[in-house]
Amino acid sequence: MPDSPAYNPQLQSPWRAPRLSLRFWPVFQRNLLVWRKLAIPSLLGNIAEPLMWLVAFGYGMGALVGQLTIDGQPVPYILFLASGSICMSAMNAASFEALYSAFSRMHVQKTWDGIMNAPVGLDDIVLAEMLWAAFKALFTVTAILGVMLALQISHSPKLLVAWPVLLGVGITFSSMALVFNALAKGYDFFTYYFTLFLTPSMF
């Protein structure tokens, strides 16, 4: 009720500036400790698809296409494909973590409820989830960059410049995915995100 002394319009409105603190860091560490037990299977799963793209399309179709000309410079098709695979993997990894994994922690496992029994606010949890998803994306693309170096697809020092750019991609897509997460009633809702937004973004 507006006349009630406990009524606070600022708390009732969802449109407010986030109240952030350093308490997001223990939440981030918690996700890291849990994930560390599954790091190897997670890594293999994240790099399997782009690796198949590189082998099937890069070497297979690359033998037919040969080289592309970009800004007057010849570029091997596999290098062209690998660059897109890196961006696609960053988008996928950040989105998947901020959708399915974060939704499970929020609704299924009730992890967020347990964390909020400590002096940690919801804004700190959301920030930790966003940064964690971005970290997962950065970890994934680092592995793919390692594959590119191992297969001698590229040795350009510009690969180092890709890290901050891909971190920005991870933060951007994890933020958008968390918005969908907040609106979702179940896992099926995420199909709209992948079908109508993420997949067209790859092209």
Which role fits each region the language model picked out?
Residues 1-203:
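Hydrophobic transmembrane alpha-helices and immediately adjacent juxtamembrane helices
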